[in-house]
Structures are given as C-alpha cells and as structure tokens.
Amino acid sequence: MSEKPILGVLLGNSAGVGPELVAMLALRDYYKDYCRPVIIGDLRMFEHGLKVVGGDVPHYAVDDLSQCDWTKGFPVLDLKDQDPAQVVYGEANAYCGASDLRQLDTGIELCKTGKIEGFVFGPFHKGAMKMAGLHDESEHTYLAHAFNLTTPFCEVNMMDDLMTVRATSHIPISDVSANLTETTLREAIELGEITGESLGHKPRIAVAALNPHCGEFGLCGREEVDVIGPTIEKVVKETGWNVTGPYSADTLFISALAGDFDVVVTMYHDQGQIALKLVGFQRCITVAGGQPYPIATCAHGTAFDKVGKASVTTDSFERAVRTTAKMALAKREKISG
C-alpha cells in the first residue's frame, strides 16, 4: 500500500505549453514524491519540451508498460504521432488535436486494463480536438462515453481543499432558471459527494442560492423555495449526506474558504469560477468528476501566448499531479477494504 501509484502524464496539445509543463516538473524531479509517472505522447515532443525549458533528464521510450523501470529515468510511451518540425505552435490545428485524442484514448485504455491507476494531462485544446473529429461537448463527455458512465459526471473545479460543482454549466445565464431542476441539482450534489469521497473523506457540502439574499423567502425569486430547499431536504433524508443550504452566494465562499465546507454546489458556471479564480487562480485545478479513475489537469488552457518561452507557471499542474495521486491512493485503499 505504501508504493506510489502509477500515473499517466499526458503531454497535452503540442501547440501549447503542455510539453513544457511536463518537462519542467521532470527537471525538478517533482513526480517522484507522488507517483511513478509514465509520460504519454510523442517522445520527440517531450524532448522538445525539455529543450525549451533548457535541460535534460534520463528518459527512454517504451512500447509497453512492462518495460518501465523508474530507476533508469522517465519512461515515455511513445505515440510517434507528432513531429516538432511540423507543429504550428500557438495555433489550434487538427494535427495537434488528433494527438490530443490519441493521448486520451491511450490513457483511457491503460486505465481500463489496470496498467495505470489514473492520469493527469497537460492542457488540451477543445477547438483543435473538434477539428480532428471530436463530436462530444468536451473531453469530460468523451471520457464518460469511453467509460460507459450512467452516473453523473462533470468537471469539478478545485482550489486547495475546496471543490465546486455546478447545477447548470455551459448555458446562457438567461437559461439557468429553466434548467435548475430537482434532477440537475441532485446530480450536482451527488457528484460533489462522489468526488469528495474519492479524496478519502465524507465531504461537507454547501449549496448556494441562485437569487440575491437567498431569494428573501420568495420575494426575490422562487428557486430557493420551490427547487433548491426542497431538493436538499430530500437528498439528506434519503442519503444521510452532509448537505446544507441554500446559502447566499455572496457570503458562502467566505465560510467555505475559511474551511467550513469541502464542496460548494453552485447554480451556474461563473458563480463558483469567479470566486475560486479571484482568490487563487494558480492554485486551481480541474478534476474529471464522476469518472471511475482519478483524472485531473491544470485549470488554465494551452496558453498559446506563452508557448516556447518557458515562462508558464507550474503551480496548477503540480497540484493536479498531487491530487490525482491522492485520489489514486484513496481508491486503492477503498478497494482493499
């Protein structure tokens, strides 16, 4: 049980900063404290990332994970699909998007076959993935289809030990009320519970209000009275989970950031995003909530404006590695009883 988990480390979109991020952490030997990493992507792109950041580390290509020997350096599962000389850096393109999908497919298959316990990925580019044939809304939907999920899933935003999940997500603000139902709220609460448990504890879940001043007992909006409050009561009665609310959103994050809660369920996208990113954007990560394996990435994107400059900060990616490793260990302990 003390052995560190084997995690895939996907390079991310070749036109972005992903290969640099992966290389930076390798140069600092960061991974060894948390996992046994298997770098997944084109070997040449990893070497390109090392060149950009001005260093080198012992590394070697493998065709199968049985060939991994971490005493010899970093194993790279070489996908042989990205020539650094052909990459158009700082732009979304199908060539790099195809590699994004191939990296994801490889990570998924390695999880399914038990060869890795989860993976962390450098930033992908959704537009490039769609150019390459992605038909799903996002990589999270792509993962859910690959794992045949029938339970709630969504991206979960996390800063330090605080997570946020959403009752509604990528829809216009004018559509939020119509899409805020008992079903969508229950799914968000369930996702918060599942993701909290994946980190090894029973989470304290707070549910935000939608309207100012928590709706003022129906005088300033009915959602708290008609949907949010009754749904919380039903969930607590049926499951016994530690769920409370609704709380006025303008003050909820004060207590949440003070450590009173582990999960905040927000009613729409920016209600939680603004709070976390304002307080500590570099400390934020994205967890693939509800997936059967630990999967996470940094909160920022491909950062095309920083490509090739070795100037991107690594805080978020470091936290993604740590969190994925923590989730992998918690899952291992749960399975072993």
Per-region residue spans from a language model:
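Contiguous, glycine/small-aliphatic-enriched amphipathic segments in soluble metabolic enzymes
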Residues: 1-139, 183-267, 271-284, 291-296, ...
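Active-site glycine-rich loop that binds ribose-phosphate moieties when present
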Residues: 141-145, 149-151, 171-195
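Short, flexible loop segments at boundaries between secondary-structure elements
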Residues: 146-162, 289-305
